[in-house]
UniProtKB/Swiss-Prot annotation:
GO molecular function: protein heterodimerization activity; protein methyltransferase activity; tRNA methyltransferase activator activity
Limits of the TRM112 domain: 2-119
Protein name according to UniProt: Multifunctional methyltransferase subunit TRM112-like protein
Pfam families membership: Trm112p
Location of the protein in the cell: Nucleus, Nucleoplasm; Cytoplasm, Perinuclear region
Tissue specificity comment: Abundantly expressed in the testis, also expressed in the brain, heart, kidney, liver, lung, muscle and spleen.
Chief location: nucleus
Organism of provenance: Mus musculus (Mouse)
Function according to Swiss-Prot or TrEMBL: Acts as an activator of both rRNA/tRNA and protein methyltransferases. Together with methyltransferase BUD23, methylates the N(7) position of a guanine in 18S rRNA. The heterodimer with HEMK2/N6AMT1 catalyzes N5-methylation of ETF1 on 'Gln-185', using S-adenosyl L-methionine as methyl donor. The heterodimer with ALKBH8 catalyzes the methylation of 5-carboxymethyl uridine to 5-methylcarboxymethyl uridine at the wobble position of the anticodon loop in target tRNA species.
């Protein structure tokens, strides 16, 4: 699971609502998978990223590259875009869990795929 994906996921356990984001990341296996650098794509994604959640996830994985906020004029800052490309697209969580901050529900990550399926009693009716 890429950190870009993590930044888009939230818990939909009954009664949680918007308090199901960001999911707490606990990784037991992480791999770096090189991906071709596309500065235009990264620049388009930066405004869509929930920055505090990205910083929290990066801190959990001991990734020091993530600044506390995007740099001014990041669209033209290749160094910044390369760092964010690495963090968002090349860091791959293969095994671990995601935890709902409100309910505490754990969602497993297996072979890079987060399982967000809920039991019937956990869903809204």
């Amino acid at each position: 699971m890429k950190l870009l994906t993590h930044n888009l996921l939230s818990s939909h356990v009954r009664g949680v609502g918007t308090r199901g984001f960001p999911l707490r990341l606990q990784a037991t296996e992480v791999r770096i998978n090189p991906v071709e650098f596309n500065p235009e794509f990264v620049a388009r994604m930066i405004p869509k990223v929930e920055w505090a959640a990205l910083v929290q996830a990066a801190d959990t994985l001991n990734l020091a590259e993530v600044p506390k906020e995007p740099t001014e004029g990041y669209e033209h800052d290749e160094t910044f875009l390369r760092k964010m490309h690495h963090v968002l697209l090349e860091v791959d969580v293969l095994e671990g869990t995601l935890q709902c901050p409100e309910s505490g529900r754990l969602f497993p990550i297996s072979r890079g795929i987060p399982n967000m399926l809920l039991n019937d009693e956990e869903t809204e009716t």
